[in-house]
Curated annotation (Swiss-Prot):
Its EC number is 1.1.1.-. NAD(+) binds at residues 155-156, 234-236, 260, 283-286. SUPFAM superfamilies: Formate/glycerate dehydrogenase catalytic domain-like (SSF52283), NAD(P)-binding Rossmann-fold domains (SSF51735). This is Putative 2-hydroxyacid dehydrogenase SERP1888. It comes from the Bacteria. GO terms for molecular function: NAD binding; oxidoreductase activity, acting on the CH-OH group of donors, NAD or NADP as acceptor. It is an enzyme of class 1 (oxidoreductase). The keyword Oxidoreductase applies. The active site is at residues 236, 265, 283. It comes from Staphylococcus epidermidis (strain ATCC 35984 / DSM 28319 / BCRC 17069 / CCUG 31568 / BM 3577 / RP62A). The lineage of its organism: Bacteria, Bacillati, Bacillota, Bacilli, Bacillales. Belongs to the D-isomer specific 2-hydroxyacid dehydrogenase family. InterPro entries: D-2-hydroxyacid_DH, D-isomer_2_OHA_DH_cat_dom, D-isomer_DH_CS, D-isomer_DH_NAD-bd, NAD(P)-bd_dom_sf.
Length: 317
């Protein structure tokens, strides 16, 4: 019987779809799957459902004798050696679109949390408490009417821009290509990175990762930002040099930061945890019931298509 191996628990809606068609084995151990367990799991599998936290390198691919598809449960796919998979005639798919609203919502939530000191205020209220309302007490920054600079105006970046416009924000964006139709629809302005860094009050990273973006935001870029600016990263961790971010915060080169992704994920640079003006979330960009169920359906349906001889919808290689 055709076999599918899943590298970690996924929502039942996708799991049940797969079980209707194939023999399914799913890793259900404590923590993330280790390499040897994954190698053993894919040895006789026709399909692998991988997670963003699952490293699928050449060694893993070579361990699979029958593999036809790697369906990645996530919009990103930099955890997979997609080029080598193609050399082995293995399709790699992802789950685009499903993450858009959830991640855009979180991006705006991070902006509000760090600018209005919501997390800091929650901690104060639960611990020492406060003496009451006072004119100079616990001031933050308003979001309405400010300028947002979006790095990566793809689906998620575009959704962030639409939400920002509801706050009467001016929208700047940068990326490898200008998107004139989206500019007109949203009311955004295309600028180069330096112009964005110098003018934005909130800089959001919503780009997918590729090696050319490694440490795109480094000491030089922090030095170009306003001293009242905030950096928001809901894209990919390695786009930001976290040590340079720590130094920028130490030197008050920027006012604060909010991160959902990390350079050395799942490890978080310890120094970041000490700043009250930094909000940290555990990579929950698309962690909603709606998005995760949709992602499960996508990986299941693309796997079913491939193993039934049809072309998957979301091939990335």
């Amino acid at each position: 019987m055709t076999k599918v191996y899943i590298a970690g628990a996924i929502p039942e809606v996708g799991l049940n779809l797969l079980k209707e068609h194939f023999e399914v084995d799913m890793y259900d151990g404590e923590g993330l799957i280790d390499k040897e367990t994954l190698k053993k799991g894919v040895e006789h599998a026709d399909a692998l459902i991988s997670l963003l936290s699952t490293s699928v390198d050449k060694d893993i691919i070579d361990s699979a004798n029958n593999l036809k598809i790697i369906a990645n449960y996530g919009a990103g796919f930099n955890n997979i050696d997609v080029e080598y998979a193609r050399q082995q005639n293995i399709d790699v798919t992802n789950t685009p679109h499903a993450s858009t609203n959830a991640t855009a919502d979180l991006t705006i939530g991070l902006i509000l949390s760090v600018a209005r000191r919501i997390v800091e205020g929650d901690h104060l209220s639960r611990t020492t408490g406060f003496d009451g309302w006072a004119p100079l007490f616990f001031r933050g920054r308003e979001v309405s009417g400010k300028t947002i600079g979006i790095i990566g105006l793809g689906e998620i970046g575009g959704a962030v821009a639409k939400r920002a416009r509801a706050f009467d924000m001016d929208v700047l964006y940068t990326g490898p290509h200008r998107k004139e139709e989206k500019e007109r629809d949203i009311g955004a302005k295309y600028v180069d990175l330096d112009t964005l860094l110098k003018n934005a009050d909130f800089i959001t990273i919503n780009a997918a990762y590729n090696p050319s973006l490694h440490h795109m935001i480094d000491t030089e870029q922090f030095n170009k930002m306003k001293s009242t600016a905030y950096l928001i990263n809901a894209g990919r961790g390695p786009i930001v040099n976290e040590q340079s971010l720590v130094e920028a915060l130490d030197n008050k080169a920027i006012e604060g930061a909010a991160l959902d992704v990390y350079e050395f994920e799942p490890e978080i640079t310890d120094a970041l945890k000490s700043f009250k003006n930094v909000v940290l979330t555990p990579h929950i960009g698309n962690a909603t019931f709606e998005a995760r169920d949709m992602m499960a359906k996508i990986v299941a349906n693309d796997t079913i298509k491939k193993l039934n001889g049809d072309e998957p919808q979301f091939i990335v290689n």
